[in-house]
Every structure is written in C-alpha cells, then in structure tokens.
Amino acid sequence: MKVSDRRKFEKANFDEFESALNNKNDLVHCPSITLFESIPTEVRSFYEDEKSGLIKVVKFRTGAMDRKRSFEKVVISVMVGKNVKKFLTFVEDEPDFQGGPIPSKYLIPKKINLMVYTLFQVHTLKFNRKDYDTLSLFYLNRGYYNELSFRVLERCHEIASARPNDSSTMRTFTDFVSGAPIVRSLQKSTIRKYGYNLAPYMFLLLHVDELSIFSAYQASLPGEKKVDTERLKRDLCPRKPIEIKYFSQICNDMMNKKDRLGDILHIILRACALNFGAGPRGGAGDEEDRSITNEEPIIPSVDEHGLKVCKLRSPNTPRRLRKTLDAVKALLVSSCACTARDLDIFDDNNGVAMWKWIKILYHEVAQETTLKDSYRITLVPSSDGISLLAFAGPQRNVYVDDTTRRIQLYTDYNKNGSSEPRLKTLDGLTSDYVFYFVTVLRQMQICALGNSYDAFNHDPWMDVVGFEDPNQVTNRDISRIVLYSYMFLNTAKGCLVEYATFRQYMRELPKNAPQKLNFREMRQGLIALGRHCVGSRFETDLYESATSELMANHSVQTGRNIYGVDSFSLTSVSGTTATLLQERASERWIQWLGLESDYHCSFSSTRNAEDVVAGEAASSNHHQKISRVTRKRPREPKSTNDILVAGQKLFGSSFEFRDLHQLRLCYEIYMADTPSVAVQAPPGYGKTELFHLPLIALASKGDVEYVSFLFVPYTVLLANCMIRLGRRGCLNVAPVRNFIEEGYDGVTDLYVGIYDDLASTNFTDRIAAWENIVECTFRTNNVKLGYLIVDEFHNFETEVYRQSQFGGITNLDFDAFEKAIFLSGTAPEAVADAALQRIGLTGLAKKSMDINELKRSEDLSRGLSSYPTRMFNLIKEKSEVPLGHVHKIRKKVESQPEEALKLLLALFESEPESKAIVVASTTNEVEELACSWRKYFRVVWIHGKLGAAEKVSRTKEFVTDGSMQVLIGTKLVTEGIDIKQLMMVIMLDNRLNIIELIQGVGRLRDGGLCYLLSRKNSWAARNRKGELPPIKEGCITEQVREFYGLESKKGKKGQHVGCCGSRTDLSADTVELIERMDRLAEKQATASMSIVALPSSFQESNSSDRYRKYCSSDEDSNTCIHGSANASTNASTNAITTASTNVRTNATTNASTNATTNASTNASTNATTNASTNATTNSSTNATTTASTNVRTSATTTASINVRTSATTTESTNSSTNATTTESTNSSTNATTTESTNSNTSATTTASINVRTSATTTESTNSSTSATTTASINVRTSATTTKSINSSTNATTTESTNSNTNATTTESTNSSTNATTTESTNSSTNATTTESTNSNTSAATTESTNSNTSATTTESTNASAKEDANKDGNAEDNRFHPVTDINKESYKRKGSQMVLLERKKLKAQFPNTSENMNVLQFLGFRSDEIKHLFLYGIDIYFCPEGVFTQYGLCKGCQKMFELCVCWAGQKVSYRRIAWEALAVERMLRNDEEYKEYLEDIEPYHGDPVGYLKYFSVKRREIYSQIQRNYAWYLAITRRRETISVLDSTRGKQGSQVFRMSGRQIKELYFKVWSNLRESKTEVLQYFLNWDEKKCQEEWEAKDDTVVVEALEKGGVFQRLRSMTSAGLQGPQYVKLQFSRHHRQLRSRYELSLGMHLRDQIALGVTPSKVPHWTAFLSMLIGLFYNKTFRQKLEYLLEQISEVWLLPHWLDLANVEVLAADDTRVPLYMLMVAVHKELDSDDVPDGRFDILLCRDSSREVGE
C-alpha cells in the first residue's frame, strides 16, 4: 500500500481493521464507504472452499471446478504479512434479522440467474431485476447467513429437545407408529450442516416481503414497508376476527429479540399467506374482501404425498392462534432437523420440503376453520367436559358408586388430546347436591316446561337413539331427550350451558376472595396442592401420585420430566385397577381438604392396619419431610444351607463350589443386606451360578413368591440364557416381553430380556405399579420383586452407539427390587463406575463399609438408587491373569477367510465333534463367509440386521443341535454364550479392542484355540469418540494385565500365559490339540510347496480389498481347481524341465510332479499316480537325487543318469508298468536297468506322467492331451499324445533314437532335456533302450507300456477327467486335499461365484419364460384353472407396509446390488413373484390367521428371495389346500355347476330374497341404485356399513381418477382400512382397484350394459339406469369388506364359501344364479338384495328377522 493510500486509509477511521484482517477468509468485509472512495480498487475473483467454507481468492493453482464456481468482487488489496494478502470488499453495517445486507454499487452481477436456480431451487417462481439484486445479497454474505441459520436451528433444536413432550411439539412431529416423539439427538456438527443447507431458504423467509411476488400484501400507506396485516389476517381466517397483537407478537420476549425465533416465525406466516394467495390482485391498495363463496382459490386442495401432518387447533381465538404459532415453531425444527431421516432435506423437484409442510399445515388449519363441525381428534372435547355432563343416555358420564354412595364423574377431557376417561369421585356433600338436582329439581323443571317444549334442535354432538329415522326426529323429541339426559341446560336459548358461563362464575366467586382464579389456574393450583400437601405416605403409594397427575389432565411424561413424578400409565393396568387407583386418589384428596374425615373408598378395605397407622403418623406432621417407609411383608429366614440345597438340585448330589471366592459371593448375594452388588470375574468363571443358585433358593420359599429379572445385552443370548436357567425345572423362566405385554402371570420366577426391554417405558410403568397390580390381581402382598440382574453391564459405557437407547433406564424405580446385581467379565472399576452412573445409580462405593454401619446409614433409607454399589473384583483378588487356559495366536495373513478355512478344516479333521465361532467385522462379511463355507461345514450365521425372533432361533439351534459346527457372526456372538463343545474361536477384525478380545476368548470355557487373524499391510481404523482403542502389537497377556490393573511381568518369568508360543499353563487336551493341528499344518505345507512357485498372475491380485466373495458351489470350485491344474502343473513341468532336467525331473517326479499331480488331480488320477509312484518311489528318488546329481547329470546321462533313473524307475516305472505289463516285462525291465533302460523307463515315466497329468486336467484328455496343456507342454507332449500314444511310443523305439538320446544328453543336460521334452520325449526315451532291452522293453512298450499308456489315457484318465469335470463333484474328492483347493480359489469383486450359482438355481426354479409368469404356474395349476384363480392387481401395494418394500436395494430381489441374483432379460422379478406368493397365502387364511402369518414371516419382510425359498418348501401342501378349498369356486366360475337359491335350505327359511323371482330381484336392484343416484350417496361407504353420506363428485365424474380423489377426500379409504381387514394389505391396494387391474371384468360388464339396454328397448319399456363401471366396482368392494353382510350371505347361500382376495370376489359376483322361478340373474344382484334386506323393510312381504335359526356348524354374522 502506498504512503498516500495509507494516509487516506487512516483518515477513513477504520477502527476494526486489525480484527478484520485476522479473519481467515481472503475476502474481508469493510463497511467504510470513505475507504473505497479514496483508495483505488480492483476486480478479483473469489470462490468458496467446500471443505472449510472460507472465501478464497482465485490463484494460478486454483482448480477448474473452483474457477467455475468463482464470483467477482470490487476489492482493495492489503498486504498483512510476508506474501500474505487480504482483500477488502464494501459491505454496509452488519445486517440484522429484519433488514439484512444492502446491495452496493461495487457489486458486479455475474450469473445471478444461474445462482438463483441452483442455490435457492425456486425456479418455479418469477423474479425481476430488483429481485435478483435482493437475492444476490445472500451470495455476497453467505457466510453470515450460514451462521445465522445455524444459530436459529440450534436454538430450535434446544427448545424441542428440552420440551419433547410439549403439546405443540407433540402435535407437529410425532412418530405415528409408536406415538413417541422423534426429536433426535443431533451433534453440533450435524446441526451446522443442516443449518447451512437451510440458509438460502432462511434468507428467502427473511426477505420475502422485499420481492415483487409479495407486493400484493404490502401496506398501502406511503413509506410503510411492513405487511398489510389486516388484509393478511382476513386471508388467513376469513370467518373469525382475531386480535392483531397476537398475530404480530407471538411472545413479548420474542419480539424484543430475547428469542429471535419470533422474527423468523413472523416471516414464515407471511410466506404462508403468499403461498395461499391467488397472486397479485389490483396492486397494493386493493382492499377487496373475499366472501365465503370465494374461498376455494384461496385454500387449494393439497395432495399430501404421504406426508403425515397432525391437525391443529383452529386459530379463531388469540389463545389458539398462539398455540398454532407454537406448532409452527416446532414445525421449523421438525422439517429442517429432527425428522430429516436422510441427508436430503430439500426436495429438488418440488422446492423446499419445509414449504410443503407449511402449506399442508395451514391448509389443515384453514380447513378446520371452514368446516368446524368436522370431527377433529385434537378438538374433541374442546372444554373440560363440564358442559357435557349427562346422567342418562348414550353419552352418560355421571354415575353412583354402589359402595360409598358417592357421585362419580367419567370425564374424557385431556390436555394431550387423548379421549381416555378419567374417574373423579365427589365428596358426600357435593354428591348430595347433585343427586338432589337430578332427582328433584330436574323433574320440577320438566313439569314446568311441559310436553310442548321444543327449544332444542338436533346438533351433531347429540347421539340420538331409539328412532328408526333420525332425520324425522322433531325438536320436541330432541328437547325431551336432552331434559332427561344432560345436567346443565339453558332452557331459554335451547342449548347447553356454555363454557363461558361457568368461566364467568369463576370470575365472580368466591366473592370474599381478593383474587379470582380461572379454570386453568384453579386446576394448576389443585394439582400443586396435591403434589406438595397430599403427598405419598408410603413407598407403595407412588403410583397414586402418578394417578393424580393423570386425573389433573397432565400426561405421564409431563408429570415425570417437569414435576418429578414417577412414571406411570393407566393403560398399563386393567380396567378395575385403574378405577381403584383413581378412587384412592380422590379419597386422599377429600380427606386432606377435610370434606369427609371418615370417607373411605371401596378399595381402602383391603389395606392393612399397619398401613393405616403409618399413614396417620405421617399425616400428623405435614410440614416435615416425608420419609419413605417400606411396607412390611412376610419374610422367611435364610440360611447357608439354602444355597447348598439349590446347588444339589441343579448339579446333583456331588455339587461343590469352584473355590472359596464363588462360595463367598453366593452367600453375599443371598444373605447380605447390600442393596446393590457389582461383580467382575473372568469369563468362564461361573458368574451365572452366582445368581442362579440364590434364585433357586428364593424360589423354594413357600410363603413369599419372588419375581426376578435378568437382562442381557443382545438378543442372541436370550435362548442360551433361558436354556441354562431353566434346566432341571428348578426355575420357571419366561421372556420379559410376556411381562410387558400381559403382566405377571403368577407362576414365573425369572423373566429374561435384553437391554432394550429394560429401557422401555412399558417396563418402567409395570414396575412402578407392581404393588398395586399384585394386590388387585392376586389379593395378596406376598409376591415380591426379587433380584434385578444385569449381565455384561460394561456395555452401558462401552457401547457408544447404543447409549441413546439406554436413556430410559434412568426412569426405572430400582428401589422396588430387593437387590440389584451387575455382572461382567470386563468391567474394571473405572468402567463399572461410569456404567452405573450412566443408568442413574450413584456408582461404586469409594470405600468399604461395615454392614452394621450400613444399616445405620441414612443412605439406606433412601433406597437402592441412592446407595453406592459394592464392587467384588475377583480378578484382582486372585491376582491371576484371565484366559491363561486358552492358546492365543495372533497371525498376519494374506487372506483372513482362507486362513480361517484352513484352521477350521484342520480342527474338524482332528476333532469332528467340536464347534467353532468365527467373529467377522461386518454383516456383509458374515453372509459371504456363510455362503462360501456351507459346502464344508454345517454353518449358522447371525448379525444385527436379523429380527429378534430369528436371532433367538438360530442361537438356540447352534447351542442345542450337535450337528452344527460353525457359528459366524459379528461381535454380538462373543458375549455370554456358553457352549461345551466349543474348541476354537477365530476373530477376523482389525479394530478389535481389548474387551471384545477378552469376551471372545472367554467363550472357550475348558480350553481351546483362539486365532486373531489380520491382513498383512493393513492398518487399524481410527476409533470413534468414546470407543476403546484397538489392541496393540505385542504380547496379548500384557495388554490383558494392563486392562485389569494387574502387575506387569514384562521381561520377567511368567510373562506369557497361553500366548507367544507358551504352553505351560495349557491343559493336556489343549496341548494335544495344538500338536495335531501343527502336524496337519506341516502336511498342508508340504502338499502346497508347488504353489509357492506359481506365477504371480495366479495369486490374488488384490489382497487388501475389504470385501471378498468366495466360490460357493462345487462347479465353481472345480473350475478354479482345473484352471489351476492346467496353469500350475504345466508351468511347473516347464520350470522343472528347463534348468536341470535330471535333478528336476526326478525331484519333480518326487516332490513336485507327484505332489502337484496328487494335489491338483482328483481321486482317479491320484490312484493312477499313486499306482505308478509309490511312497517308496519318492524316497528312492530323493535318495538318488543328491547334491552330486547335478554334476552327474550335467556331465552326461550315460551311467549316472541310468543309475539315478533306474533308482527312480525300479519302483515307479515298474509299479506303473507293472500295472499294465506282465511278469516277464517287469523282470526284463528290472534286469535291463542299464544305460538305456533307465532312459526308456524315465521316458515312460515322463510320457505317462505327462499323459496322466494332462489327462487329469480337462475333459478331452483322451483324444488330445496336448489340447489341455500349456504352450511348452503342448510342444513336447503333442508328439507323444497324438491320435495314438501307443503308435508314437512304438514308433520311437528305433536304433537311431539311441544316438539321438546320447547326443542330446552329452553336451548339455538342460538343453538335452529341453530338446527331449519338446520334440520327442517319448520317442527319445523309448528309443534309448538297448537292443536286448528293446526286444524286451519294446515288447513291453508295444504290449505292456502301450497298454499301460492307453489304459491310463483311456480308462484311468477318462475316469479322472470325468470325475474332475463333473459339475456336481464329489464332496469327499473335494475335501481330499483341501489346501490346494483353497489357495487356488478364484476371487471376483462383483458377481461372485456364489451369486452366479444362486442366480442359476433361482433361474432354473423360476424360469419366467413369459411376461405372464404367475406363481400359480409354479405351484402346478393348469391354464384353465389359472384363468379363474389369476391374481389380478397384485403388486407392491398389496403388501403391508415394510414387507418387500425396502428402498436403496435392487428392485427385483431386494438385495444389495453386489449380491443381486436377478438375471439379464428377466421379465418378472422375484419380488413380483413373492407378492403373488403372499397373495396365495392370503387365499387360504382368514383375517386373524393371515395377521399371524405376517408376524411369522417377519424375518423375510426384507428378503423376497428367501421368502420364495420358504414358500417353495410348502409347494405341494399349498397346491393341495387350494385345490381343496377352492374346488367349489372353480366349479362355479368355470360354469360346471350352477347356483340355485332353492338348493339353499337356510336361505329359503331365513330370507325373503331367496323366495323372490328373478324379475323382483332385478327391480329391487334397480330401485337401490335409483335411490343412491337421487341422493348422491357414496356407493362404497353405503355398501360397506349402510352409511348414507353424500358425495356428488363420485356421480358426476366419468374418470376413475376423479372418483378416487373424491373418495380419498372424504376419507373413505382411510375408514375402510381402519374398520376392516383391508388394513392387512397395503394402504393403496384398495384405491388402485379402480385402475386397469380388472379391465377384463370391466369390458364384460360394459358389454352386459349394452345388452341390457338393447333388451329393454326391445321389450318396449323404459330402460332402467344401471350404474357405470366405477360405481359398480365401488359396490362390489364395499360388499367384500362388509363383514356382517359376508357372514350373512355365506350362511344363506350354501353353495359358496369364503374367498379372501378381492379379484376372486369380483369374478364370483358376475356368475349367474337361478332365482326361485328358475330365471337367471347375476349373483351381484342377489347380493344387493340381501344387503338391502339387512338394512330396510323394502322387501316384498315385509321385513324378515335377522336372528335366524343357527346351524350347528356355522353361525350367523353379527
């Protein structure tokens, strides 16, 4: 900067220059206009860094993408350091929420249009140039608005999280499935990300009044920038005036900027008005009022598209408007942060999701204002219910208690919007007044008014009964009903006493009070008195406090979280119990007020005298602190002998404790008064017996019944725990879910559940109400809560990702239990203390306390939760490092799965009856290993994505089924499972921490092997916040000592215990198992030596890939084996025969060829090879191929080669030749082991080995072995394996071959060998025999050797080739040499061999040869049967929610795309077939059975392919059931049988319709439709339940879509699903029946309409108007779901039975039946006649009696 510029800069008085330059952005905002007018400026480009969010200047090295996103600014450059430059840009004073930044003349617009479209996503709106200038402010100040949006969103989230159960919050975002709030706990970084995404839309909301599209609502006064609130007010609520102060000032503190949300909400409301407006109309001064008739364009119809928005209170009063605005505040949080299940908060297609929410929300609000008579759950009842008190009639809520003779009121008003009734008992004086008013004063009032009184009209709130036609009821009738029903009437106006009248009395009375209270303040004051004065006097009376909260119209959550009242719910107890609770609460209140000192409700007689005395003593001193006194119960004495007897019951008469520590702990738990105990013992120590024996001892007590609870961390442990704890019948064990759903059953001693059950609200409520429930249900107080046992409680602290799920445990009343026991094998003091505090307990005791001192301690009186937990650390007491009995090996391998498979194969070869556990790191790896290893073992796999029932079932199967060998799972299988046969644990996880290691190794109770396998060149991933770090390199035992706080022995004697090769502490069985495994490993290493020499191309190309897939079929495995044999064997032969032939040929015949041949060939080839090269051959060959062999061989192959080869061929060749030659040949060959015999024999060996080796590689070995070998072997073997090996071998036994062989073996053995192996190995070898040998050996060559070679080529090679090429393979063959198979297994990243095989199997099972593939074809039905049973309209909407409807997966099979089993060209997906299979199951089940079936197949809800396999197992059974159940249906629909009404005896006796003629039935049918047409009645609703509601759009529409929209608008489909079994299908299934599903029926029906019209005209009568297709379809759908009608029709018409699918019902309805006069009418006409008969008396000859005579086998419907 120049000196002159610096002076000008100083004059600018830029005080904040230093702080501004410290900003990390290259672009710094400067508000000084003087600076920019004084100092020269320049234009530079800037961009926003995506990672840091900072504004950076574009430089030479800036990337292309950043340059593309850059923008230009007018700036002043300032050097702030060495080579550090900042740029100042002009921006006026920092914008606030009201105004925002102001554009300056230094702004250079660039790509503003593109910016608006891409950034704001409001391309559907039109902007002018001024709007673009306004919108560009955000681009210039994006960082500011990002931070602004983040602060607002953070504030919203804090409010919603602090008050998740507030009424406004609950209404706006609530999980509509579970009813619980779904405000999620978000990290600050997540909220910041959401805030940045929300920033553009926050900017729009703040500046929406500055845009041209908002000009319609600008104020008319000059200079006024605010909104015309009066006009906006009228647009929002055109019928009800509201006070403007509540509109503009939501809360005073908000508008005073104490809470800036007020400004945001104000703008949101303006945006809502903008959305509903019809556009700019007449400029800013247009004051035209909108009438009621013009409301449709103001509030357009909104299609929710699946968005669930709870209806709000109508904002027609200031208070309700404020509530509505509070809901909008919650809506802002809901739409922007809390309900954002995915990262995509905004909808790219339809703009901002928040705008849609607001639009739908205010549409509901405005619609409620217009239609105030419509039923709204949030508005019923709208007052405290005092106006609607009735002493008679259907709405009666005033009763008299039989015992106390007191008036009781059942009111259903509740603040949280529910209609659950509340029982309130009045005192005696008030009851007398009410009784006198009803019995005396009301009768006098009726007499005074007289019989002509008719002031009351029929209002919707009245439930008029006793009249056949409610529309014909007169006002006199209504008035008489009201006088004899309701208490508070305004007879002058003809209405109930308004709520305002009662409120007015509250303002006037009591007259002597200086300050009056309204109803709300009175109610709050009463409940405050109830909390602080009418307090609980007993420990067991805490539920009464909760009952008082409920009776005061507070939710349970409000009472617990805000007022500190215990959790409770009246819905968790029976109806009688709820009544007694509320009676007792009223009694306590009346007694405290002194209204009746001697009043006792009927329940109080069950109290004990001791309780009354204690209560009187407590009530005498209200001002003192109320201490909790434990109610006395019978208690039997305990002794140490109880534990011994329990042990003998469980383990037999020879029972003994493991050690004194176990004995002492059992006595401590059973005998001591310590309320809370924590135990840390090593895995496998027997922690279960520490509480199992005391539980058995408690169960043996006769007078007192103890009910205890055990909780484990994972579902997979439930089955194992229930089996162990329920053995020998010592305890009655049941799941906790039974207790939560049904309560205590009276027989269970121990309930077992998981942590989620412990944290559930229902369990907390059950425990809180335990005392009262037991006393009310069993009429005794001798049932007591025993032990609360939590196993592996360290998970409360270490399971970081589950800690949010444990929050509900803090609400549990621990004091209700006699003792709490916490067990773990990996919970040192620090972990245990933190885990206990996390669930609401005090933590561990800091120092030991004597039991006598404990009894005197004041803490004991406060209960278990306030007393510290005593810790028993058996690991420190014994000073022994755990898990020393297990041999722990840590290995780094290339492939973890392959190494694990080797270990498992070796284990089961050594110990066939053993079991093993494999712990994988991911769920995908679990499934892949299970699929890959199924051909080797009986596998069970488990991971967290399975359902709870499936986890329990699989765990139980592995524990109980001895044939199951391997359990594969994630780390959830490492805790708590006890399996005696377990001998090996393998962990495949690079992120294994010390706790997971100890828990996994601890599964080996009696010793065994534990392998920790990790990949080479791998690194451990960074652990998440709060998680334990992974285990380190080095000694495992030392890390275990460090974790438990034991003394380190690093570098000392005894450091290694069961690790690092130490075996001193292992059992003899474990050592023996290790030795056997080592021997097997040596054999495998010897057999796999040739694999080391494999080219790198045949090794795994990418061993560091995280996800691997393995071959799972014999076909794929054989392919890999054969390919490896081709490549590796031939390559090894080439390598063997190039460098040093003699040594390598013999050595390879011994070590390489034999081993390779043995390893790579199957049984038949091995047999051939073994026949030719015995074990002695190898030894003899090895003996002869010493170090001097090379010298010998390189020199010449005359004497030494002969000797060496003779040694090789005396056993090998003779054995191989002996297999095919005679005795003379053997003797001659043995005798002729001279210079030439050996070469001959070695050549024979070479030829035969080549033939054998090549013959065992492929299928076409016989004809041409060279075709299957590699290049080098093809060259040398092709000469000997042409058309006839015999001829080539005979042809090569000439004299010239000897010289050739001698020539090739003199100069260079290597070249000679290469020459002999390329041109004529067999010929040169066979020709090397001498004259005498030739005569003998050539004969042997022609007769025996040829036959040997031929036999090997034809028989043995064929057999081996056939066996090897067999696709199915042989399990024993494959497992004969498993090591080589594993090492040669191919690997593919996508489309693994397992997937390919699975795809092939499914394709064969479901060929899908045509587009009309149907599951009925799969079941075996014929085409004519399928025609009538065809499943029309079965698609995704038929399935219930969550069944085969997962997103983000393959649409055809619902699997991950890497595991997709769909095949190219597939016309019908597996998911489609699964839908139809589900429909077939629906055909065979009624509503209840089908509902149970859906629950049974819950594990398959996300796996249609697995469901098809499950379905195909029952294929024949299902086919038989359909044939049996639908035989009548096929006979009728195929016109083989005709229905005649006269054949139905019950129909003729019980219905007039069955005695009508066909003409009468048709006339009745047309009359019904004529009445429906005239009244414009909803057809579907009428035939569903005879409800005559009007729907004019349905009759005027000619399009199916319009009809569906009309029915949907009226809520018909919603009522249909809630009232009938339609809810068992998808929510859109019934709606889609109006589409093209039934086009064949539609064409048939429309054809019948034409024929009907033609017949009517031909007869000369006026044609009757018949319904069009849509109305006709609505009729049949309504009849199908009308349960009463269906039962009635099936009872009367004996020829038909039940059908459960709508298409079958439609097809059945169109068959013709014979009426009483033998004329044919469609069955649907008969249906309509029966339907009409059930509802009216328009049937000829009068109305029939519905209560017909009942058949013994079938009952009439209700």
From Swiss-Prot:
Keyword Nucleotide-binding among record annotations: yes
InterPro entries per UniProt: DEAD/DEAH_box_helicase_dom, Helicase_ATP-bd, Helicase_C-like, P-loop_NTPase, Sir1_ORC-binding, Y'_ATP-dependent_helicase
Domain Helicase ATP-binding positions: 668-845
Description of what induces expression: Induced in absence of telomerase TLC1.
Any Pfam family the entry gives: DEAD
Biased composition (Basic and acidic residues): 1361-1384
Entry GO terms, CC: cytoplasm
GO biological processes: telomere maintenance via recombination
Hydrolase recorded as keyword: yes
Residue intervals of the Helicase C-terminal domain: 900-1051
Binding annotation for ATP: A681, P682, P683, G684, Y685, G686, K687, T688
Low complexity bias: start-end ranges: 1142-1360
CDD domains: SF2_C
Main function: Catalyzes DNA unwinding and is involved in telomerase-independent telomere maintenance.
The protein, known as: Y' element ATP-dependent helicase YJL225C
